[in-house]
């Protein structure tokens, strides 16, 4: 990787704002996408036990936290060239037994959600910026296992 560019960070920042403009709606898109690809994922998220409930504050809060972490990862990549994950968060993912294929499902759901949030502003460049930030966050979480 040739370093996370200023443009990549700007793309993540602007599309993150689009996500934040309607967190409840995009939280539903995000978790619905996860459950469509991996129905067993509901066991990893206690707040999904009864499905995707758009009024569940835990569902909305978790989506907002995840998207915020990826957004913050973009900033870390730009500033420091690396992402450092919270050890407790890495430990939680290890305790839950999160696997590489599950990280991929979450990434795909994240990209689908961002695509919906930005509409016609979606591009390969935008997708790549989010993918790099997410992949680096996932790698940092796995290191913290």
Swiss-Prot record:
Domain Globin: 3-145
Location of this chain's protein in the cell: Cytoplasm, Cytosol; Nucleus
Presence of keyword Cytoplasm: yes
Residues given in the record as O2 binding sites: 62
GO molecular function terms noted in the UniProt entry: heme binding; metal ion binding; oxygen binding; oxygen carrier activity
Binding site for heme b: 65, 93, 96
Tissue specificity remark: Root nodules.
Protein name: Leghemoglobin
Source organism of this protein record: Psophocarpus tetragonolobus (Winged bean)
């Amino acid at each position: 990787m040739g370093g996370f560019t200023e443009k990549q960070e700007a793309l993540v920042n602007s599309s993150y704002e689009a996500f934040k403009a309607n967190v409840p709606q995009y939280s539903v898109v995000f978790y619905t996408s996860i459950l469509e690809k991996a129905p067993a994922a509901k066991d990893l998220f206690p707040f999904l036990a009864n499905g995707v409930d758009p009024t569940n504050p835990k569902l909305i809060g978790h989506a907002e936290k995840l998207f915020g972490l990826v957004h913050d990862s973009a900033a870390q990549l730009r500033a420091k060239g690396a992402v450092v994950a919270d050890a407790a968060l890495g430990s939680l993912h290890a305790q839950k037994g999160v696997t590489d294929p599950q990280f991929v499902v979450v990434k795909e759901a994240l990209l689908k959600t961002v695509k919906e949030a930005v509409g016609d502003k979606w591009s390969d460049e935008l997708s790549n910026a989010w993918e790099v930030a997410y992949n680096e966050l996932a790698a940092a979480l796995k290191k913290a296992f």
